[in-house]
């Protein structure tokens, strides 16, 4: 953990870096808005829904996201809250972008899980929780949409415990729901916070009633709801877990908050808990050793590359999570994979699509480095030491298409666009060794649409897809050079290079893949590859 002797101890200890995970439509983008609003980072929280209107959620900033009202790429937003400085990483809400989300989860120290209280635990939430469990990431839970009719709150907590295998500790408890929603009782503060709906960027003054037995409570919410609240709380406090910060930090227990993001209610209670309990920047495993956040020398790793954040400049930004030390404008860094010293004078910080030049940044912060094709996902930057941070994955795609040009003269731009998009992890590109085809591989169908729309808007290339006889791909490697050469000679027609020039086996059927593996037991066929 952080040592208080560190010169920049105060800066690092106030950092909280977290991501929001949820099922699509559970209200994640609205929560992102309102978190920024309560952090006073956005003066007007624009609604996401009005697809025809000009107000788009601050974090959904690419053209296609604006059209469809879904967040497809990860945005980074930094804002102060209380005594803390919060780095919020917004992850794609659409299931096709699980890879991008997965990689983002390697760059955070905690997560906020948003659940639609009318629906409960949904499929995407299950998958994302599996990912957070690999690193025992601490989870804070927000039960959203209390201004609608919801499921029984006790049932919701049981479902989280049974399906997601994490103990629940309620911090606030709802009083009614839908039209009858009156507010929440804050168990830790022994006070009732009454609901008055705030819309857009208005945060209403909260009326607070101290104590559960206060007669004012009965007057404010009605005798029936007050009696129901006292009865429920007796049950809840008897049956649920007390909050234990150690268990929370181990990813075994989640504090649960209730509210409505759309009505600007409950988000601040959750933020209070998150900033109070979530960890400041954590140590991180490199292949060589564990790196502590309190170390003075700079280290960081690239978890995402985003092309064309500024269409005027055709640029690419590499998102770097700082693990230790301080970034200062103009400092020299070692780009470990290339073994090259680089001078970084123009790193940027983010406020969801708005960029500012970073003069300094600390462990836990995310900075953006301008990338002219030399930086890849998974790259490590240090102040001299040779380190490689581990655990940033690439997945074998499950869907494939051949990509064709409407104008054959634009082959060069097409290849450039595809390689750049594959470097940022939006899609994977395979170039078969035996022909000039370009095969695009994705984890979900939406990725194909994104690629065609971005090729058109960013590279001025009109492309179309055709079906291709590919069922799956595996990266191949072998320690025995001679046997590998023989394997390559025999399987020439099934081999391709990906965007990073790694050799992959392209199988027309799963049966074909199984046969190839049986025939060449010494060759490793990998479904995931570390960046």
From Swiss-Prot:
NCBIfam families: prfC, PRK00741.1, small_GTP. One of its GO terms (molecular function) is translation release factor activity, codon nonspecific. It comes from the Bacteria. One of its GO terms (biological process) is regulation of translational termination. GO terms for cellular component: cytosol. It is found in: Cytoplasm. It holds the Pfam family GTP_EFTU. Keywords: Cytoplasm, GTP-binding, Nucleotide-binding, Protein biosynthesis. GTP binds at residues 22-29, 90-94, 144-147. This is Peptide chain release factor 3. It comes from Vibrio cholerae serotype O1 (strain ATCC 39541 / Classical Ogawa 395 / O395). The gene is prfC. HAMAP family: Rel_fac_3 (MF_00072). PROSITE patterns: G_TR_1, G_TR_2. Belongs to the TRAFAC class translation factor GTPase superfamily. Classic translation factor GTPase family. PrfC subfamily. Residues 13-282 form the tr-type G domain. Increases the formation of ribosomal termination complexes and stimulates activities of RF-1 and RF-2. It binds guanine nucleotides and has strong preference for UGA stop codons. It may interact directly with the ribosome. The stimulation of RF-1 and RF-2 is significantly reduced by GTP and GDP, but not by GMP. The keyword GTP-binding applies.
């Amino acid at each position: 953990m952080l040592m208080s002797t560190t010169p920049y101890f105060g800066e690092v200890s106030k950092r909280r870096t977290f991501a929001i995970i949820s099922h699509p439509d559970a209200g994640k983008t609205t929560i992102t808005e309102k978190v920024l609003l309560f952090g006073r980072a956005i003066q007007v929280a624009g609604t996401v829904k009005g697809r025809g209107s000009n107000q788009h959620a601050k974090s959904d900033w690419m053209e296609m996201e604006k059209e469809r009202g879904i967040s497809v790429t990860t945005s980074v937003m930094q804002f102060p809250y209380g005594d803390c400085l919060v780095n919020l990483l917004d992850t794609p809400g659409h299931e096709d972008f699980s890879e991008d989300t997965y990689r983002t989860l390697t760059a955070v120290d905690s997560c906020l899980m948003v659940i639609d209280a009318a629906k409960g635990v949904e499929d995407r939430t299950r998958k994302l929780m599996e990912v957070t469990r690999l690193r025992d990431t601490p989870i804070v839970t927000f039960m959203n949409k209390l201004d609608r009719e919801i499921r029984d709150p006790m049932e919701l907590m049981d479902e989280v415990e049974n399906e997601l295998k994490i103990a629940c500790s309620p911090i606030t408890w709802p009083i009614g729901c839908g039209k009858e929603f009156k507010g929440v009782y804050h168990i830790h503060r022994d006070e009732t916070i009454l609901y008055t709906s705030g819309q857009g960027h208005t945060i209403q003054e909260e009326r607070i009633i101290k104590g559960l037995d206060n007669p004012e409570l009965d007057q404010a919410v009605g005798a029936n709801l007050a009696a129901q609240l006292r009865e429920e709380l007796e049950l809840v406090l008897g049956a649920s877990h007390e909050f234990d910060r150690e268990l929370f930090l181990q990813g075994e227990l989640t504090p649960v908050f209730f509210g409505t993001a759309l009505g600007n209610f409950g988000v601040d209670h959750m933020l209070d808990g998150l900033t109070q309990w979530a960890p400041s920047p954590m140590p991180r495993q490199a292949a060589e050793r564990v790196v502590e956040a309190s170390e003075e020398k700079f280290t960081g790793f690239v978890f995402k590359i985003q092309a064309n954040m500024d269409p005027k400049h055709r640029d690419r930004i590499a998102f770097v999570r700082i693990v230790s030390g301080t970034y200062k404008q103009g400092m020299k860094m070692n780009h470990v994979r290339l073994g090259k010293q680089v001078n970084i004078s123009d790193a940027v910080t983010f406020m969801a699509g708005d960029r500012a030049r970073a003069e300094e940044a600390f462990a836990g912060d995310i900075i953006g480095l301008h990338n002219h094709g030399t930086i890849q996902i998974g790259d490590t930057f240090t102040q001299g030491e040779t380190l490689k941070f581990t655990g940033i994955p690439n997945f074998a795609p499950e869907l494939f298409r051949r990509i064709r040009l409407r104008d054959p003269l634009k082959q060069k731009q097409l290849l450039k666009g595809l390689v750049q998009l594959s470097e940022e992890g939006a899609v994977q590109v395979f170039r078969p060794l035996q022909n000039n085809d370009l095969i695009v591989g994705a984890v979900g169908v939406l990725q194909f649409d994104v690629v065609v729309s971005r090729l058109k808007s960013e590279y001025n290339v009109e492309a179309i897809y055709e079906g291709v006889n590919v069922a799956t791909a595996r990266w191949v490697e072998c320690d025995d050079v001679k046997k590998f050469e023989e394997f390559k000679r025999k399987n020439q027609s099934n081999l391709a290079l990906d965007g990073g020039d790694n050799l992959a086996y392209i199988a027309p059927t799963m049966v074909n893949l199984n046969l190839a593996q049986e025939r060449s037991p010494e060759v490793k066929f990998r479904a995931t590859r570390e960046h």
